[in-house]
From Swiss-Prot:
Stated role: Involved in mitotic DNA repair and meiotic recombination. Functions in the recombinational DNA repair pathway. Essential for interhomolog gene conversion (GC), but may have a less important role in intersister GC than spn-A/Rad51. In the presence of DNA, spn-A/Rad51 enhances the ATPase activity of okr/Rad54.
Region (Required for chromatin remodeling, strand pairing activities and coupling of ATPase activity): 2-9
Gene source species: Drosophila yakuba (Fruit fly)
Name this protein carries in UniProt: DNA repair and recombination protein RAD54-like
Domain Helicase ATP-binding: 172-346
Residue numbers spanned by region Disordered: 1-54, 751-784
Modified residues (Phosphoserine): 20
Biased composition, class Acidic residues, residue ranges: 775-784
Keywords: ATP-binding, Cell cycle, Cell division, DNA damage, DNA repair, DNA-binding, Helicase, Hydrolase, Meiosis, Mitosis, Nucleotide-binding, Nucleus, Phosphoprotein
Classification via CDD domains: DEXHc_RAD54A, SF2_C_SNF
GO process annotations (BP): cell division; chromatin remodeling; DNA synthesis involved in double-strand break repair via homologous recombination; double-strand break repair via homologous recombination; double-strand break repair via synthesis-dependent strand annealing; meiotic DNA repair synthesis; oocyte fate determination; oogenesis
Length: 784
């Protein structure tokens, strides 16, 4: 209803005056309050006057009345009339008159999460203050606890809690005058989860009661960018949004990176996930502005300080650097320096200073002709170097996983060459091609020897891999065409032409018929993967394949599909060069490493794909080598490097180039009648005529040296019935080394997995106790 504007319907008009208008009722109330205040002030003056005048006693409304006119009573009255004073320095009372509506009051600081809660992980403890000291402090400068979000701390295992605390102390400079660290845990220990915890904690809180960083960058191989996004989503349950840079046009990428770099606070996606290649291309944008922290996954890519990726990352404006690498850090001093210098520049000085102080002395002591004094100095310098870098490096082995994962059986299988393989192998060794490689020592001859070694490895796998060389009558195969059958056809794979393929075919058939286990097949060559594919089609096995030709987006879908229990994929064919790092293939519990790599770290990365968090079944790892061949020589060199912690060979540099003439002569020797060249060179004292008479020591497992594994020249005592049956059926196995991950198997069936406290069943194949071993084990370490 519309109000009338008639004078009778309107309120009193505001008088024409410069004074503000006050309604009559408010005028009356205001006047009464003023009179009351004046009366109170007058009474207060009279009370004070009465107390000062001792001879005057007035009948006033005093707070405390007294009748006796004595000094004592007057003193008491004076004390009781005194106003209360708060016993705090610089205390200013506030009776409400100084408060202003809308101004935020100063409140006491509190940690984001309860530091005394059950299972709390406290990364920073503030100094302990007394209550009196705290009252005298500026409340805006009081430090608080830094406590990991219970969402994460409740699922972290003890070694992961230790790792998170170590990384936090390093990046915050609590362990020394540096802000970087290297997380060198072996595969499967949860490096990703530990980093997710660190990033989330730094983005959310700090001792100053505010976030420590406002954004972070995670750099990884392109195949793992999507995996990092999944890990953040999985563990934080969508509480943190990431910015994955994969695919997209150049314009969109530049726009997204510029927005990420320029925004300093309240960023919707505070974590950038980017590949090494993309970072190198757009380094100019990312290096313009500061960033809170950078994490480099698979950090062994940065062991060459001269490459462009290393230099681009060094230009990033951040002091907090974390490097992740499951590859064992061995004493290749140049790459060792590069890794440490990346996370903590100048910790070891310049490259020239490092070489003068450490590298020269250590390498001189490793020479075979070094003096006793040089060897002693090398030991001293090595210990000094370890003492420095141990401040920023943490490394735990996957022995920790034995508490949480099912048992793992690892087997090295020596398979016999077939008659065709044997003839091709010996003919090539006797050819003029190999003789010339052994006669020359120049660089050109070394490259030729490298090609010859690759040819021998292909003969060990299957004759199909060298069929083109045979038909073209290349050097070394001039007279080999008559070795192959007349009906030889490469389009129809014949497993009987290769000892390893025949064994693989038997074992896959037994696994398929025996249960619902899935299998991972790994090779260093895509040509071998082609043969795997032919075998799978021939036997009608469902399979998926991952190699360097597969796009990054498709890789994630392929892995997820294979891990799905409802999937019909039986085989996962994997190129170790394309996907040996970071993949989680827990859908399978059996893995075949079909051919060995010169670098033991590459094989270990590839073989760690199935024995990981989430695995519920016992795992079986099969490493296949051809008996007495070049593959056994490679295996021996792997073991030698691991046991003696010798120099690891750069991934981009062929190991064969470093061989001397004597080394090459050993590589090109072959004994067709030997069961295992590796076992012969061990000079094992636990075996008599290749039959084991004394078991390994009780405290050994599959991480121990091969000399401390079980040695089998027949199928008795094998931990795997599938292998034992295949040994009998195909008659192509000559020797087996095997061991397990732990002394007691953890059986994880569906019913136990569903329960909160699964019951552990004793291992039926438990090894009998043996007396302590003699000193021969130490001598065996020098067998290669």
């Amino acid at each position: 209803m519309r109000r009338s504007l008639a004078p009778s319907q309107r309120g009193p008009m505001r008088p024409e005056s410069r004074h503000s208008f006050t309604p009559p009722l408010l005028k009356k109330n205001k006047r009464s309050c003023q009179q009351e205040l004046e009366r109170e002030q007058e009474l207060d003056r009279k009370r004070q006057s009465a107390l000062r005048d001792a001879s005057n006693t007035m009948d006033l409304p005093l707070p405390i009345r007294f009748t006796a006119n004595s000094e004592y009573e007057r003193a008491i009255a004076k004390v009781l009339a005194r106003k209360f004073k708060v016993p705090m320095d610089n205390y200013v009372p506030d009776y409400g008159g100084k408060r202003v509506l809308g101004v935020r009051r100063c409140i006491s600081r509190r940690p984001l999460h309860d530091p005394v809660a059950c299972n709390a992980l406290v990364l920073f403890n503030p100094p302990a203050y007394t209550e009196h000291e705290r009252m005298g402090m500026d409340p805006t400068k009081v430090l608080v606890h830094v406590v990991v979000d219970p969402l994460l701390s409740n699922i972290l295992r003890p070694h992961q809690r230790e790792g998170v605390r170590f990384m936090y102390e390093c990046v915050e400079g609590k362990r020394g005058n540096f802000n970087g660290c290297i997380m060198a845990d072996e595969m499967g220990l949860g490096k990703t989860l530990q980093c997710v915890t660190l990033v989330w904690t730094l983005l959310r809180q700090g001792p100053e009661c505010k976030p420590t960083i406002n954004k972070a960058i995670v750099v990884s191989p392109s195949s793992l960018v999507k995996n990092w996004e999944k890990e953040f989503t999985k563990w934080l349950q969508g509480r943190l949004l990431c910015l994955p840079m994969e695919g997209g046009t150049k314009e969109n990428t530049i726009r997204a990176l510029e927005q990420f770099s320029m925004t300093s606070s309240r960023l919707g996606t505070p974590v950038l996930l980017i590949s090494y290649e993309t970072f190198r291309i757009y380094a100019e944008i990312l290096c313009k502005y500061e960033v809170g922290m950078v994490i480099c996954d698979e950090g062994h890519r940065l062991k060459n300080s001269d490459n462009l990726t290393y230099q681009a990352l060094m230009g990033l404006k951040t002091k907090r650097r974390v490097l992740l690498s499951g590859t064992p850090i061995q004493n290749d001093l140049t790459e060792y320096y590069s890794l440490v210098n990346f996370v903590n520049p100048e910790m070891l000085g310049t490259a020239a200073v490092f070489k003068r102080n450490f590298e020269s002395a250590i390498l001189r002591g490793q020479n075979t002709d070094s003096t006793e004094g040089e060897r002693q100095r090398a030991i001293e310098k090595t210990q000094e170097l370890i003492g420095l870098v141990d401040q920023c490096i943490i490394r735990r082995t996957n022995q920790i996983l034995t508490k949480y994962l099912p048992v793992k059986f690892e087997m090295v299988i020596c398979a016999k060459l077939t008659s065709i393989q044997l003839e091709l192998y010996t003919n090539f060794l006797k050819s003029d091609q190999v003789r010339r490689s052994l006669a020359d020592c120049n660089e050109k001859a070394s490259l030729t020897a490298l090609a010859d070694i690759t040819t021998l490895k292909k003969i060990c796998s299957h004759p199909d891999l060298i069929y083109e060389k045979i038909t073209a009558r290349e050097k070394g195969f001039e007279n080999s065409q008559n070795v192959l059958p007349s009906n030889y056809n490469t389009k129809d794979l014949n497993p009987e032409l290769s000892g390893k393929f025949m064994l693989l075919d038997f074992m896959l058939a037994a696994i398929r018929a025996d249960g619902n286990d899935k299998v991972v097949l790994i090779s260093n060559y895509t040509q071998t993967l082609d043969l795997f594919e032919q075998l799978a089609r021939k036997r009608k096995y469902g399979f998926v394949r991952l190699d360097g030709t597969m796009s990054i987006k498709k890789r994630s879908k392929v892995v997820d599909r294979f891990n799905d229990p409802e999937s019909d994929s039986f085989l996962f064919m994997l190129s170790s060069k394309a996907g040996g790092c970071g993949l989680n293939l827990i859908g399978a519990n059996r893995l075949f490493m079909f051919d060995p790599d010169w670098n033991p770290a590459n094989d270990e990365q590839a073989m760690a794909r199935v024995w990981r968090d989430g695995q519920k079944k016992p795992c079986y790892i099969y490493r296949m080598v051809a008996s007495g061949s070049i593959e056994e020589k490679i295996l021996q060199r792997q073991t030698h490097k691991k046991s003696l912690s010798s120099t690891i060979i750069d991934n981009n540099e062929s190991a064969e180039k470093h061989f001397t003439r004597d080394d090459l002569k050993d590589l090109f020797t072959f004994d067709a009648d030997i069961l295992s060249d590796t076992h012969e060179k061990l000079k094992c004292k636990r075996c008599v005529q290749n039959v084991q008479v004394k078991p390994p020591p009780d405290n050994t497992d599959c991480t121990s040296h091969l000399s401390q594994w079980y040695h089998c020249s027949n199928n008795r005592g094998l931990p795997d019935n599938i292998l034992a049956q295949a040994w009998t059926d195909c008659k192509c196995v000559s020797f087996v080394f095997h061991h397990r991950s732990q002394a007691q198997e953890i059986v994880a069936i569906a019913e136990e997995a569903a329960s909160e406290q699964p019951e552990e069943k004793p291992d039926r194949r438990k090894r009998p106790s043996t007396p302590p071993s003699d000193d021969s084990a130490d001598e065996d370490f020098l067998g290669f």
